[in-house]
Amino acid sequence: MWSRRFAVAGAVLLGAVLVAPPGAAAAPTVPSPAALAAAAPAGLIPDRPSPEDVRRALVRVERASHGKVRLGVVGRTNEQRPIRLATVGTGSTRLLYMTQQHGDEPLGTPAAVRALWALGVPDSAWHRWLRSRVTIDIVVQANPDGAVRNQRYNHDPSASGDYSEPGVGYDINRFHNPITPIEDNPVPESRAILRYWHATHPAIVVDYHMQGRYLQPDGRETTASILWPTSPLAGPAAVDRSRQLAVRNYDAMTYVAGANVTRYPGGDYEGIARNAYGILGSASLLVELSDLPQEQTAFQIRTAFVSMIATAQGAADGSLWRVNGDRADSIPARGPSLPDTPALRRADAA
């Protein structure tokens, strides 16, 4: 449930970004974060959904939206499962979100399905305005073969070499390298996302993952971490926009969702989606949700939901590009692993 403090803060923050620039027509009043979150019906999708759960939920969203949410497939896995795409909006600014590249990191997926309902089913003036300004593509559960096995990797018994578990599969999030010819990429999930990027050239890419549990220097537990491209191959303009995107998400996740957000200690390898799509020119961001106890699952899903909505709003009215990206340097470091949580430790390098 949204506390009154966060509901008020969220209304102020999300309303402020919808103020039109001088000379532009005023945007319609934004619904409160609580109202947006409550739009999706209870039981729309489980917290840790199977591929079949995802299919059923997306079909339900599409039908309820009367065509405003459009469904598709960007590719198929080695087991011929569809890599599902859902799209809302018709605007000229394109956004690409992806969830669950690692099959055992599920919470971005229910957040995405609920965001699709919240943005695509209601038909207020604000909803029509937003959909006219942005097109949001979401690769929902990018690794369905891994999801059915609750494993990080895709399914490929022939996998070998770097960034693989031999006999198990490949780490999808190491195979977005924009320098490697797509036809030489051994990972069908990564190939599909790369091809879709080249077909649409999104201005913004946000990749949703999960991580272990960590303590900030002040003793609070990190509930989410974020990071922009750090590869030296990413151009300065893309990095600057990515840092603005990071600050926008930090503010929304902190002051609207109530998350404790830190800076993810990621590497600079160009095959990581965060880096790859920055190299290609998008504003690119990694969002990591901490693997908290079950009673905090709804909170974590809400954090990702807020990130998705805030990014869409900032892109729709352009306020995202007026954010001071230098503030990204003040996002606190993630901190050390939380002790005595062996069941939640994971190889979580995104």
Name what the model sees in each region.
Residues V74-R76, V88, M98-Q101, V139-P144, ...:
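Active-site-proximal beta-strand/loop segments in catalytic clefts of secreted hydrolases
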Residues S92-L96, P106-V239:
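Active-site/substrate-binding loop(s) of hydrolase catalytic cores
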Residues R84-S92:
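Short beta-strand-to-loop junctions in surface cap/lid or active-site-entrance loops
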Residues A7, T29-S50, N185, E189-A192, ...:
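C-terminal accessory segments enriched in acidic
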Residues Q80, Y153-S158, G267-R274:
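Alpha-helical scaffolding within the catalytic cores
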Residues P28-E79:
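Short glycine- and acidic-rich boundary segments immediately preceding or forming the N-terminal edge
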Residues V88-G89, G161-E165, A276-S282:
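Short glycine/proline-enriched loop/turn "hinge" motifs that connect secondary-structure elements
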Residues M1-P28:
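Secretory targeting and sorting signals
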